[in-house]
A protein has these predicted regions:
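Substrate-binding pocket helix/loop in short-chain dehydrogenase/reductase
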Residues: 42-43, 50-55, 137, 148
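Active-site loop-to-helix junction immediately N-terminal to the catalytic Tyr of the SDR YXXXK motif
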Residues: 46, 92-100, 112
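Active-site helix of classical SDR
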Residues: 66, 102, 110
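Residue(s) in the substrate-gating loop at a strand-loop-helix junction
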Residues: 86
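Alpha-helical segment proximal to the catalytic Tyr-Lys
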Residues: 71, 115-119, 176
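C-terminal helical subdomain
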Residues: 126, 150-174, 178, 185-187
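The beta1-alpha1 cofactor-binding region of Rossmann-like NAD(H)/NADP(H)-dependent oxidoreductases
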Residues: 5-16, 48, 161-162
Protein backbone atom coordinates (compact mmCIF):
# COMPACT_ATOMS: atom_id res chain seq x y z
CA UNK A 1 0.00 0.00 0.00
CA UNK A 2 1.16 3.50 -0.81
CA UNK A 3 -0.47 6.65 0.61
CA UNK A 4 0.40 10.02 -0.91
CA UNK A 5 -1.06 13.35 0.17
CA UNK A 6 -1.42 15.72 -2.76
CA UNK A 7 -3.37 18.65 -4.19
CA UNK A 8 -5.36 17.10 -7.05
CA UNK A 9 -5.88 20.53 -8.64
CA UNK A 10 -2.10 20.97 -9.02
CA UNK A 11 -0.86 19.78 -12.44
CA UNK A 12 2.74 19.08 -11.35
CA UNK A 13 1.63 17.35 -8.15
CA UNK A 14 -0.60 14.99 -10.14
CA UNK A 15 2.34 14.02 -12.33
CA UNK A 16 4.53 13.49 -9.26
CA UNK A 17 1.92 11.20 -7.69
CA UNK A 18 1.61 9.10 -10.85
CA UNK A 19 5.41 8.86 -11.09
CA UNK A 20 5.62 7.73 -7.44
CA UNK A 21 2.97 5.06 -8.05
CA UNK A 22 4.80 3.75 -11.11
CA UNK A 23 8.11 3.74 -9.21
CA UNK A 24 6.51 1.77 -6.35
CA UNK A 25 4.47 -0.72 -8.38
CA UNK A 26 6.08 -0.77 -11.83
CA UNK A 27 2.92 0.28 -13.66
CA UNK A 28 -0.46 1.96 -13.32
CA UNK A 29 -3.50 -0.12 -14.23
CA UNK A 30 -6.40 1.85 -12.77
CA UNK A 31 -7.06 5.53 -12.11
CA UNK A 32 -10.18 6.63 -10.23
CA UNK A 33 -10.74 10.40 -10.19
CA UNK A 34 -13.00 10.99 -7.20
CA UNK A 35 -12.08 14.42 -5.79
CA UNK A 36 -15.10 16.66 -5.39
CA UNK A 37 -16.45 19.65 -3.48
CA UNK A 38 -19.53 21.86 -3.55
CA UNK A 39 -19.97 25.58 -3.03
CA UNK A 40 -23.72 25.79 -3.62
CA UNK A 41 -25.52 29.06 -4.20
CA UNK A 42 -27.55 30.68 -6.94
CA UNK A 43 -25.52 31.97 -9.90
CA UNK A 44 -26.34 35.62 -9.15
CA UNK A 45 -24.89 35.19 -5.64
CA UNK A 46 -21.94 33.02 -6.66
CA UNK A 47 -18.49 34.52 -6.31
CA UNK A 48 -15.72 33.94 -8.80
CA UNK A 49 -13.84 32.13 -6.01
CA UNK A 50 -16.75 29.69 -5.47
CA UNK A 51 -16.80 28.99 -9.21
CA UNK A 52 -13.02 28.53 -9.40
CA UNK A 53 -12.81 26.34 -6.28
CA UNK A 54 -15.36 23.85 -7.61
CA UNK A 55 -14.00 23.76 -11.17
CA UNK A 56 -10.42 23.35 -9.94
CA UNK A 57 -11.16 20.46 -7.61
CA UNK A 58 -13.89 18.71 -9.59
CA UNK A 59 -12.76 19.14 -13.21
CA UNK A 60 -9.17 20.39 -13.38
CA UNK A 61 -8.08 17.55 -11.09
CA UNK A 62 -9.52 15.03 -13.56
CA UNK A 63 -7.60 16.68 -16.41
CA UNK A 64 -4.41 16.70 -14.32
CA UNK A 65 -4.57 13.03 -13.38
CA UNK A 66 -5.77 11.86 -16.80
CA UNK A 67 -2.87 13.76 -18.38
CA UNK A 68 -0.36 12.12 -16.06
CA UNK A 69 -1.88 8.63 -16.10
CA UNK A 70 -2.65 8.40 -19.81
CA UNK A 71 1.02 8.97 -20.67
CA UNK A 72 1.99 5.96 -18.55
CA UNK A 73 -0.95 3.86 -19.74
CA UNK A 74 -0.07 4.62 -23.39
CA UNK A 75 3.39 3.16 -22.76
CA UNK A 76 1.79 0.07 -21.19
CA UNK A 77 -0.89 -0.16 -23.90
CA UNK A 78 -3.49 -0.79 -21.22
CA UNK A 79 -5.39 0.82 -18.39
CA UNK A 80 -8.73 1.90 -17.02
CA UNK A 81 -9.59 5.49 -16.11
CA UNK A 82 -12.78 6.09 -14.13
CA UNK A 83 -13.99 9.61 -13.34
CA UNK A 84 -16.76 10.48 -10.90
CA UNK A 85 -19.42 12.71 -12.47
CA UNK A 86 -22.94 13.19 -11.05
CA UNK A 87 -26.64 13.18 -11.91
CA UNK A 88 -26.26 16.96 -11.53
CA UNK A 89 -23.81 16.95 -14.44
CA UNK A 90 -26.42 15.19 -16.56
CA UNK A 91 -29.60 17.00 -15.46
CA UNK A 92 -28.48 20.20 -13.72
CA UNK A 93 -29.75 21.49 -10.38
CA UNK A 94 -30.70 24.95 -9.17
CA UNK A 95 -28.07 26.48 -6.93
CA UNK A 96 -25.33 24.26 -8.33
CA UNK A 97 -24.25 25.92 -11.58
CA UNK A 98 -20.56 25.48 -10.74
CA UNK A 99 -20.98 21.86 -9.63
CA UNK A 100 -23.15 21.00 -12.65
CA UNK A 101 -20.64 22.57 -15.04
CA UNK A 102 -17.74 20.68 -13.47
CA UNK A 103 -19.52 17.33 -13.56
CA UNK A 104 -20.81 17.86 -17.12
CA UNK A 105 -17.25 18.77 -18.09
CA UNK A 106 -16.09 15.41 -16.77
CA UNK A 107 -18.55 13.67 -19.09
CA UNK A 108 -17.20 15.57 -22.09
CA UNK A 109 -13.61 14.85 -21.06
CA UNK A 110 -14.33 11.13 -20.70
CA UNK A 111 -16.05 10.87 -24.08
CA UNK A 112 -13.26 12.74 -25.89
CA UNK A 113 -10.36 11.04 -24.09
CA UNK A 114 -11.81 7.58 -24.72
CA UNK A 115 -11.53 8.30 -28.45
CA UNK A 116 -7.94 9.51 -28.09
CA UNK A 117 -6.60 6.52 -26.16
CA UNK A 118 -8.91 3.66 -27.12
CA UNK A 119 -6.54 2.34 -29.79
CA UNK A 120 -4.01 1.72 -27.00
CA UNK A 121 -6.43 -0.49 -25.05
CA UNK A 122 -7.13 2.22 -22.47
CA UNK A 123 -10.73 2.45 -21.29
CA UNK A 124 -12.14 5.75 -20.03
CA UNK A 125 -15.52 5.86 -18.29
CA UNK A 126 -17.53 7.96 -15.87
CA UNK A 127 -19.94 7.14 -13.09
CA UNK A 128 -22.84 9.53 -12.50
CA UNK A 129 -24.19 8.88 -9.00
CA UNK A 130 -27.53 10.22 -7.88
CA UNK A 131 -28.20 11.03 -4.25
CA UNK A 132 -25.73 8.92 -2.27
CA UNK A 133 -25.43 8.85 1.52
CA UNK A 134 -22.15 10.66 2.13
CA UNK A 135 -20.80 13.32 4.47
CA UNK A 136 -22.02 15.88 1.91
CA UNK A 137 -25.63 14.64 1.96
CA UNK A 138 -25.71 13.85 5.68
CA UNK A 139 -25.03 17.51 6.45
CA UNK A 140 -28.29 18.51 4.72
CA UNK A 141 -31.35 19.25 6.86
CA UNK A 142 -33.73 16.30 7.30
CA UNK A 143 -36.46 18.10 5.35
CA UNK A 144 -34.17 18.52 2.34
CA UNK A 145 -33.17 14.85 2.43
CA UNK A 146 -36.82 13.79 2.69
CA UNK A 147 -37.63 15.87 -0.41
CA UNK A 148 -34.66 14.31 -2.24
CA UNK A 149 -35.90 10.80 -1.52
CA UNK A 150 -39.33 11.68 -2.93
CA UNK A 151 -37.69 12.31 -6.33
CA UNK A 152 -36.08 8.86 -6.42
CA UNK A 153 -38.26 6.09 -7.89
CA UNK A 154 -36.54 3.53 -5.63
CA UNK A 155 -37.55 5.67 -2.59
CA UNK A 156 -34.10 5.74 -0.98
CA UNK A 157 -30.67 7.26 -1.31
CA UNK A 158 -27.87 5.11 -2.61
CA UNK A 159 -24.99 3.76 -0.57
CA UNK A 160 -21.34 4.51 -1.31
CA UNK A 161 -20.75 0.76 -1.68
CA UNK A 162 -23.21 0.67 -4.59
CA UNK A 163 -21.12 3.24 -6.45
CA UNK A 164 -17.91 1.41 -5.49
CA UNK A 165 -19.25 -1.82 -7.01
CA UNK A 166 -19.76 -0.07 -10.34
CA UNK A 167 -16.22 1.32 -10.13
CA UNK A 168 -14.94 -2.19 -9.43
CA UNK A 169 -16.79 -3.48 -12.51
CA UNK A 170 -15.37 -0.69 -14.69
CA UNK A 171 -11.85 -1.29 -13.38
CA UNK A 172 -12.06 -5.04 -14.04
CA UNK A 173 -11.78 -7.12 -17.18
CA UNK A 174 -15.54 -7.73 -16.92
CA UNK A 175 -15.91 -4.35 -18.65
CA UNK A 176 -13.16 -4.89 -21.24
CA UNK A 177 -15.31 -3.48 -24.08
CA UNK A 178 -16.86 -0.59 -22.13
CA UNK A 179 -15.34 2.83 -22.83
CA UNK A 180 -16.57 6.37 -23.42
CA UNK A 181 -19.67 5.63 -21.36
CA UNK A 182 -21.35 7.26 -18.38
CA UNK A 183 -22.87 4.73 -15.99
CA UNK A 184 -25.69 6.14 -13.87
CA UNK A 185 -26.11 4.89 -10.31
CA UNK A 186 -29.20 6.80 -9.26
CA UNK A 187 -32.18 4.62 -8.37
CA UNK A 188 -33.91 5.39 -11.70
CA UNK A 189 -33.80 9.19 -11.33
CA UNK A 190 -33.12 9.71 -15.00
Amino acid sequence: MLCIKSNAADFQAAHQVVNQVVEAFGKLDILVCNAGITRDTLLMRMSEQQWDDVLNVNLKSVFNYCHAASTQMMRQRSGSIIAMSSIVGVAGNAGQVNYAASKAGIIGLVKALSKEVGSRNIRVTAIAPGYILTDMTSSLPDTVREEMVKTIPMHRCGEAEEVAKVALFLASDLSSYVSGQVISVNGAMG
